[in-house]
Amino acid sequence: MHHYTENHVFCENENIAVVFHPAHNEEIHIHDFVELVYIAGGRGHQYIDGKKYSVMRGDMLFINLNHTHAFTTDKGMEYYNIYLKPGFISSELINADNAMQMLTLTAFEDFRETVGEESPVVRFSGGEMAEVESCLSAMLREYEHKENGTGTVLQSYLMILLTYVFRKMAAFGGVQPGENGNKIGDLIQYIEENCTQKLSLTELSEQCFYNPSYF
């Protein structure tokens, strides 16, 4: 099984990488960074930790680090990849307003139980899909041109994109506990066990993105 490291996708001093892929298959692999996948055209199948998902245009999946991932294409599937360094998420993207939403985004297994086992994390359609694709297209152009301030612009676009994701998650009522528990429950337990200490957002986010016991 291939292991993608940060050096495979990030240039020096980059925290976000954006790539558009034409149709091709990818064997099972893992990576030590966070990945957002958006299906921009066609159809295919994504496999995350051995579970198969039929995907089509408008679908977005969240793949945390150290999860196994593979996919096959059908009918010319095209897709965007957004790669994020975990340390960047915990230090730059999480703030007091979006902390719980960002942390619940890591609970992929629990959220898919809410929307159905065959569903991806979120599915956009109509005007929502057009807005998401416009945002992704702008991110790709910005990343490829790499002008002054590209990092700031990409972070701004990413927050817009994640806001669309949060809205879609909220439409399903958020993450619900599954039969096997969930990362949010574990996170709450961690907070309770350390309630006498001052906990930072970085420390809390690391419970989802870094601690191997949370995968």
PLM features per residue range, with description:
Residues 128-131, 179-187:
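N-terminal positioning helix adjacent to the helix-turn-helix/winged-helix DNA-binding module
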